[in-house]
Amino acid sequence: GPLSCGRNGGVCIPIRCPVPMRQIGTCFGRPVKCCRSW
């Protein structure tokens, strides 16, 4: 969820993560990804 995403240093981004980032989970169901920079 959004809280665990933030604790892991990620941000919630709709649809898909931009290129320099990778997905580490989801935020609000499947459409919103939790993304983190390398």
From Swiss-Prot:
UniProt entry tagged with the keyword Secreted: yes
Subcellular location, record wording: Secreted
SUPFAM superfamilies per the UniProt record, alphabetical: Defensin-like (SSF57392)
Transmembrane segments: none
GO cellular component terms, semicolon-separated: extracellular space; specific granule
UniProt note on tissues of expression: Neutrophilic granules.
InterPro entries assigned: Beta/alpha-defensin_C, Defensin_beta-like
Entry's Gene Ontology molecular function annotations: CCR6 chemokine receptor binding; chemoattractant activity
Family matches, as SMART domains: DEFSN
GO biological process: cell chemotaxis; defense response to bacterium
Similarity field: Belongs to the beta-defensin family.
Protein name, per record: Beta-defensin 12
Organism in which the protein naturally occurs: Bos taurus (Bovine)
Highest classification ranks of the organism: Eukaryota, Metazoa, Chordata, Craniata, Vertebrata
